[in-house]
């Protein structure tokens, strides 16, 4: 009897996981297209791109396993995110530091380029 219950539980779990995976595909595609529209478009200004960097980082953290990146690109991206967070967590007199968007943007630009290339490849597959 325990085997039947365990088997039923495993079937239910597999069904749930399959349904979850099927739902995430349209979400991944929609968010990937949104990131491409901002970071893959040369006509989008620098301010808009810098304003959308947190969304790109969130996208990368959520879907990094689905992006076809090299080990070197993945390591670089993780290091850049760590440095970005450290920069954003700096405080001056107890309040978050102001400005420095140019420094952060210069740091994240190669990261954004490699992620956008990975997104474009993932959408084509």
UniProtKB/Swiss-Prot annotation:
Keywords: Immunity, Innate immunity, Secreted, Signal. The keyword Endoplasmic reticulum does not apply. Induction: By a variety of stressful conditions including bacterial infection, heat shock and exposure to ultraviolet light. It comes from the Eukaryota. It is found in: Secreted. One of its GO terms (biological process) is response to UV. Residues 1-19 form the signal peptide. One of its GO terms (cellular component) is extracellular space. InterPro entries: Turandot (IPR010825). Belongs to the Turandot family. A humoral factor that may play a role in stress tolerance. This is Protein Turandot F. The gene is TotF.
């Amino acid at each position: 009897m325990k085997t039947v219950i365990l088997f039923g539980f495993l079937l239910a779990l597999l069904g749930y996981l399959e349904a979850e995976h099927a739902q995430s595909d349209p979400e991944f595609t929609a968010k990937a297209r949104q990131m491409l529209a901002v970071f893959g478009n040369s006509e989008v200004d620098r301010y808009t791109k810098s304003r959308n960097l947190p969304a790109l980082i969130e996208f990368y953290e959520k879907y990094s396993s689905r992006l076809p990146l090299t080990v070197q690109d993945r390591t670089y991206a993780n290091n850049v995110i760590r440095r970005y967070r450290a920069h954003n967590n700096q405080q001056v007199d107890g309040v978050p530091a102001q400005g420095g968007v140019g420094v952060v943007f210069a740091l994240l630009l190669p990261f954004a380029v490699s992620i956008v290339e990975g997104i474009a490849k993932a959408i084509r597959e």
